[in-house]
């Protein structure tokens, strides 16, 4: 029922908030719900742990954070989105779905980390940036022994090679790589363990991340 209502809310507000070009029933279920859930369904710590704190960076229309919250109801969810209009939509969405334990922040990730360092068990995102960039802006949010979960396409291997310096600098270790197909789409999901506290100089300002990748 919640996913049917979620679909209806997307279709109702799509033109107002410019959410997506995929507004048919089939495309919303496939591209929003099934494809966004697929990378996480193989990760057993979602079902083994209760009250996990998760931050979804660049949440947009609620993918994957709201989808995960619908399935794992005990999840303490933070949705981080820099676009103000999409934050307005996220507020409407979570209210109409009746979701509890959800915080919505209209900020850039590198700004919010100053007040929420080492606060979450899991950080994740979908289609926000290349792996080196998203790891840099995500790592400081996560507690030591927490996880960064990054769904990627077949380009994962290429992106991880470029990210090797930032992975080392931020004391991250890839502990799993989930490789599977879902409806003709090849998912590669990197799961990184955070082994030490993130150095205070990270994340750097976004313009510096873009201009001077490590």
Curated annotation (Swiss-Prot):
GO terms for cellular component: cytosol. Its EC number is 2.1.1.-. Disulfide bonds: none annotated. GO terms for molecular function: rRNA (guanine-N7-)-methyltransferase activity. It is found in: Cytoplasm. SUPFAM superfamilies: S-adenosyl-L-methionine-dependent methyltransferases (SSF53335). It comes from the Bacteria. The keyword Amino-acid biosynthesis does not apply. CDD domains: AdoMet_MTases. NCBIfam families: rsmG_gidB (TIGR00138). This is Ribosomal RNA small subunit methyltransferase G. The gene is rsmG.
């Amino acid at each position: 029922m919640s996913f049917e209502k979620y679909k209806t809310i997307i279709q109702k507000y799509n033109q107002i908030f410019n959410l997506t070009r995929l507004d048919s029933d089939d495309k919303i279920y496939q591209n929003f719900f099934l494809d966004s859930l697929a990378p996480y369904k193989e990760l057993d710590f979602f079902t083994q742990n209760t009250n996990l704190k998760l931050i979804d960076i660049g949440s947009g229309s609620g993918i994957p954070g709201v989808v995960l919250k619908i399935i794992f109801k005990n999840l303490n969810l933070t949705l981080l989105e820099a676009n103000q209009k999409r934050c307005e939509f996220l507020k409407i969405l979570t209210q109409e779905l009746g979701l509890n334990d959800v915080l919505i922040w209209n900020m850039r990730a590198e700004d919010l980390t100053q007040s929420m360092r080492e606060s979450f068990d899991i950080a994740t995102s979908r289609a926000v940036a290349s792996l080196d960039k998203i790891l840099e802006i995500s790592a400081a949010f996560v507690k030591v022994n927490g996880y960064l979960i990054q769904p990627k396409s077949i380009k994962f291997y290429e992106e991880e090679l470029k990210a090797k310096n930032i992975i080392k600098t931020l004391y991250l270790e890839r502990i799993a790589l989930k490789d599977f197909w879902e409806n003709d789409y090849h998912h590669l999901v990197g799961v990184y363990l955070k082994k030490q506290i993130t150095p205070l100089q990270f994340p750097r300002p976004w313009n510096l991340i873009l201009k001077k990748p490590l």
